[in-house]
Amino acid sequence: MEQVNITVTIQSPTLIANSSTAGVLTATRGSIDGRILRGLFATQFIKSHNLGKTAHTNKDFMGLFYGDLRFVSAYKDTVKGTSFPAPLSLQKNKNAAKETKFASNTVVDSFYAKQEYDVPEKQNLLGFKGVKGFIVLDGKECSPVSVETAIKLHMSRSSEQERVQGRSSDGTIFNYEYLEPNQVFIGSVVGPKEALESFVREFPKNLECHIGRSRRTEYGHCTMTIGDITPVPTPTSEGNSVYVRLHTPLLLGTASIHDVVGCAVASIGS
């Protein structure tokens, strides 16, 4: 299995609406979904081949976007590496009892807590709270990654005259939370080498694009850079157990979790 990194640089305020948005604030996600990346390249392919509404009849189009390639979400890149969603098993000390002697803001992986500690208070991580957001690995340590956002006030105007005047007597106000410009996010396209070679040939190395909400006005300008084809790193196991971290929701279908995970880690070792 091979991969191609996709580097997305935010050039203007960008809003990728969060599904939990409510009220007068439209919140943004802190990452760029793989479906967005696939949509950008699919749109570019349709335009360059002048396919219009008949794209689904094009064999090459279906092979690239509904075949063996998988488009992986882009997460913020840092000097320490590319971040990823913090696993739910990571717990941070909020108000643990003093007798546990946990330092303030200590982060513990609950998956290993019962192996590392010999008292119930420490094993159960009482007074701990889940770590949210994104982290990056630096050797054996992990560090939180802050995605820079800001909020801007907008007003909707009900008539053309009010739009020209720049004011409104009966419009509504709303707020957009957006990703700040000049941040870099890295995702990838994963699949067989032959399919990736076909993918890379179809597009220029650098692309201008617009993503997210209000992308036809002042939001969403980004640049994308397509990297080289490289092997997907294969982890090795030095012990008798494998720790599987899910970056995205897992759909099992009719298979068991044991069979799905077993198949995924089969190449790592016995």
PLM features: what roles do these ranges have?
Residues 1-270:
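Basic, Gly/Ser/Thr-rich N-terminal segments that form RNA-phosphate-binding interfaces in CRISPR RAMP
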